[in-house]
């Protein structure tokens, strides 16, 4: 079957499928990704190949990960005879994405992210080994605003800190709902993430626990959250820890920037480990 005549399947609501059908937006996303001939490009949720058609032949290898069996079959029918295209049928959150880019010298990721799994999928991309040099995602506009939000505004939260602690996050452009079929109930946006070279030193599990505890109590003073949040289980001297980091004990979590959260998470973990060893 030719690329231009691939059989199209109906969107499946259970899988959160909304296909990007606007060719102008498709090309803008590919320009944002800016694939190089030496890259391995990982595309998750390629659908009918709306973006893939612009990526085939532009990178060393294109890995298409599609959960929907019918869509995966259509992708194999279009490009299965190409040595530089791999079609992987499976759930991106379960199959271990790093296995498909392990031999890559350079990795880029692109995805039209299903709204119901946005956060776990974003972090799965950020935890790839080897790390991606660029990640371009189409997400719900509200989520895009949370990803790039600075401290001190309502949109700033655990997702903002978790992403910005390990990547430079940029709002690329808005995507109207009419660019998709079926038409979703909300607008979307494209964000660009570029992982930081020093991100390997971030204790992501401790950071995630800390930010969730803090932003679940975002209007409380930081010192009170650190003392009382059961998920933190920190029995050390909170004021001493905050003093060493030059953090005001009365500050609210929404005012702390991501690097400060990273330092605080590391200090709390060190404090707990030190207490356990005595």
Q: PLM features: what roles do these ranges have?
A:
Residues 1-213, 243, 254, 263-278:
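Catalytic cores of RNA-modifying enzymes
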Residues 227-232:
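Short helix-coil junctions and helix-kink-helix linkers
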Residues 240-249:
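Short helix/strand-capping connector loops at secondary-structure junctions
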